[in-house]
Amino acid sequence: MIPTLLLGFGVYLSWGLLGSWAQDPGTKFSHLNRPGMPEGWRLGAEDTSRDPIRRNWCPYQKSRLVTFVAACKTEKFLVHSQQPCPQGAPDCQGVRVMYRVAQKPVYQVQQKVLISVDWRCCPGFQGPDCQDHNPTANPEPTEPSGKLQETWDSMDGFELGHPVPEFNEIKVPQEQQENLLQNLQNDAQSVEDGFPGSWEAPPSNLTDEMTEANLTEFEFPGRTSEHLLQPHIDAFLKAHFSPIWKNFNDSLHSLSQAIRNLSLDVEANHQAIKMIQEGTVARADFQELGAKFEAKVQQNSQRLGQLWQDVEDQLHAQRRSVHHALSDVQAEVSTKLKQLVKAQELPGANGSLVMASAAAAARPEPESLQARLGQLQRNLSALHMVTSQREEELQSTLKNMDSVLKQHAEEIKELYSESDETFDQISKVERQVEELLVNHTGLRELRVILMEKSLIMEENKEEIERQLLELNLTLQHLHAGHADLIKYVKDCNCQRVNSDVDVAPEGHRDVMHTLEETQVSLDEQHQLDGSSLQALQSTVDAMSSAMDAYRGEGERARAERARIRSQLRALDHAVEALKTAANGTRKEIRLLHGSFTALLEDALRHQAVLAALFGEEMIDEMSEEAPRPLPLDYEQIRLALQDAASGLQEQAIGWEDLATRVEALEKAAGGFVEQHPQLAEGLEPSHDSGREEEAMTLAELEQEIRRLSSDVKQIGQCCEASWAASLNSSLEDLHSMLLDTQHGLRQHRQLFHNLFQNFQGLVASNISLDLGKLQAMLSKKDKKQPRGPGESRKRDKKQVVMSTDAHAKGLELWETGSPVAFYAGSSEGATALQMVKFNTTSINVGSSYFPEHGYFRAPKRGVYLFAVSITFGPGPGMGQLVFEGHHRVPVYSTEQRGGSTATTFAMVELQKGERAWFELIQGSATKGSQPGTAFGGFLMFKT
């Protein structure tokens, strides 16, 4: 159909068109990028003697400057990583530092000049239709419109007669196309923008412009033939090329979407891994596995980039080839049409002969054109099939990678949840330690009260002894007076009665007077004796009331001991909870071992998949291009993980052995208490069953505290956390303080019962107390008590001094962290890449937080606890808590709606003068007084 249309179009135009645009058959159109104007057009424009109508249009060159971004080169940079030295390495200094070289593309803004054809009036003509003759008219356009469509102006160096070799050179092996895949999003968009969308004829088409210019004022029937031919050509090209380009554009769009989603997933996984590595203490196998994974991701990114570059080059070459082919087809058709038009100008028989020869010469040309178009269609179909196959393979590869990344994301989420559980357990331990501190403070207060009561009792005892001594002296004086009186009566001389009968009345009066005086003295003596007895009775009553008061205080002390016993039971329950937490930690260790094994299997499977996907030759080639090999291969990693698994199993066995040993020690301690009841009796002389239970409870508490300290030490060694050492030292100090408190309580209880266990007999005896004898008796009783092997009074004094020092050290540890604290909120909004200023300060103890600048400066060296909460605006947001640039804690939110709040905590050791602040790196922070936007911290203890 195409040859028939072309032949009919040529014959039809031979009767209606003029020969103004005819030129030599051997002459071709010049390329659009070449400067200047074709010689035939110049001659046709200057020769106005034949036909002055519609000869006044001439083509001119039009150029414009275009700016674009192109990848000019690749840049190499060093990636620093470090890992701890393996065990047994002789020349290692604790940390092994590795450097590897990575590449990234470098883009540059470039410019190029695009040249097109613009039809204007020929020299010497002007006007809207170029009909006005003006010898002084300027042929160059003063202000180019610049609105011509530039579609075929970049094709160069293609010949229509050889389309098959060009397409054969475009085809490359599948292995080379699958090696590189990076930056498909921007490049795919640029390729889609460069494709012709509507398949309309460009305004710079020479044939269209020429025909349109020459047929403006002629009303020949050949004009309809030109308009009939152009839609057929457009329909043919649209039918053959539009589905191919549409499918190719759709595939590129889907591929770019998949790559974009993959890049987002990789970035999210990278951020999650980074958070876990910063939030927990990385072990050697974690660091090594992370370095391996990062290196593999870098290699895959380089391969993706190279693959995308190859795909872009192939698409560019295909586009150039197709555009060259279509441009040459249009040029050939225009040349043949002009030859036919030129043949129309010859008169008579010569014209018919020339027309016949031209028709005969033009007949085989459409056939060759149809053959070339068919070959072009077949090549494009084959290219479409190959592209579809490779796209399917690429989609399957991307699906596999997506599934692997999802699996890794689930594993990372599990690890993150396990770290949250560990943090909760640590918080529980801290709360229990605080409760123990409160109990210790209560015990200290009770100890002080008991000491005060004992001092008061000592003073009362001395007062009672003094009163008893005075009463004893009074009784002795009374006995002496009574004896003197009896002696005086017995010694009275009665022999002089007879001789003194005469003076009897006077003597009788004297005797009566004397007897009266004696009676008066006796009455006075009886009154004195009665007052002394009343004083003694009142003293005894006071002593009984004092003993009743002491008995009430003893009851209160017994109630206090019951309360302490209940607290000890609660502490026992807390110890059981810690045992349960230790069992949970063992389970977590086993789960981590299973996770490590699964990750090892995934790594080996990924290695096999990469080898099958890219080929052994490509992997060997890329390994040769690498600057240095990796320090470990997969076999060594597998052996290292197996060694770690065996170590974990040995550690679990050690834990079980330790549990059995602790149970044996508990049984032995219980048997020792049963075999030596006199120790409990020495502690409680009143034979109270509740006191014996208290002694046993104290012994069990001591054993549980020792076991708890050993478990905490093992957990600290397992986790290798820097803050665990301070926690272990705090627990040890707490343990020593509890032992000191227990020892002091025992001493005070023993002293109390030794002094007042027989106070009723003391009151009933009604005798004086000799303090010297009492002290001697107590010392003899102490000497009679058996001492254990290796014990001495010097050792007891030494233990008391050591416990006092430990007690003072624990108090100093927990009392020196109080004078620094701050809490501030923010009422101003913030955007990305800036420091968030919390300008509303509610607490600023120590004046170490500066609200006008938004940062906290450490006034002293120590361990600080920080907390930050931020309310993000719409869309995802991310920030980080920065400590003097050497440590960062991320805070992020992935919710699309506004008002989402994210919170994080950090414990860090700061030197004096170091700063801490919060900065926003993505998204925005809401403006206004939000309760969820706050920043605070305090000093825990100095170091």
Swiss-Prot record:
Q: Which positions fall inside the EMI domain?
A: 54-132
Q: Where is this region: Disordered?
A: 128-150, 778-801
* Effect of loss of the gene: Mmrn2 deletion mice develop normally and display no gross abnormalities, likely due to compensatory mechanisms similar to what observed with other key regulators of angiogenesis, such as thrombospondin-1. However, they display endothelial cell junctional defects associated with increased levels of phosphorylated VEGFR2.
- Output the Gene Ontology terms for molecular function: receptor ligand activity
Stretches assigned to coiled coil = 391-480, 551-580, 688-720
Q: Where in the cell is it found?
A: Secreted, Extracellular space, Extracellular matrix
Domain C1q as annotated: residue spans:
815-943
List S-S links within the chain: 58-122, 85-92, 121-130
One Pfam family hit: EMI
InterPro entries the record matches:
C1q_dom (IPR001073), Collagen/C1q_domain (IPR050392), EMI_domain (IPR011489), Tumour_necrosis_fac-like_dom (IPR008983)
Q: Where is the signal peptide?
A: 1-22
How does it get modified post-translation?
N- and O-glycosylated. Processed by matrix metalloproteinases (MMPs) including MMP9 and, to a lesser degree, by MMP2 upon angiogenic stimulation.
The GO annotation for biological process reads: cell adhesion; cell migration involved in sprouting angiogenesis; negative regulation of blood vessel endothelial cell proliferation involved in sprouting angiogenesis; negative regulation of cell migration; negative regulation of cell migration involved in sprouting angiogenesis; negative regulation of cell population proliferation; negative regulation of vascular endothelial growth factor receptor signaling pathway; positive regulation of defense response to bacterium
Give glycosylation sites per the record: 63, 67, 205, 214, 249, 261, 350, 379, 439, 472, 583, 728, 766, 839
**Keyword set, alphabetical order:** Angiogenesis, Coiled coil, Disulfide bond, Extracellular matrix, Glycoprotein, Secreted, Signal
Q: Which GO terms describe its cellular component?
A: basement membrane; collagen-containing extracellular matrix; extracellular matrix; extracellular space; multimerin complex
Query: What is the protein's quaternary organization?
Result: Heteromer of p110, p125, p140 and p200 subunits; disulfide-linked. Interacts with VEGFA. Interacts with CD93; this interaction promotes angiogenesis. Interacts with CD248.
Q: What does this protein do?
A: Extracellular matrix protein that plays significant roles in the vascular system and is required for the maintenance and stability of blood vessel. Affects several essential steps in angiogenesis including endothelial cell proliferation, migration, and tube formation. Positively regulates angiogenesis by acting as a ligand for CD93 receptor.
Question: Which PANTHER family does the UniProt record give?
Answer: EMILIN ELASTIN MICROFIBRIL INTERFACE-LOCATED PROTEIN ELASTIN MICROFIBRIL INTERFACER, MULTIMERIN-2
What protein am I looking at?
A: Multimerin-2
- Look up and give the organism this protein is from: Mus musculus (Mouse)
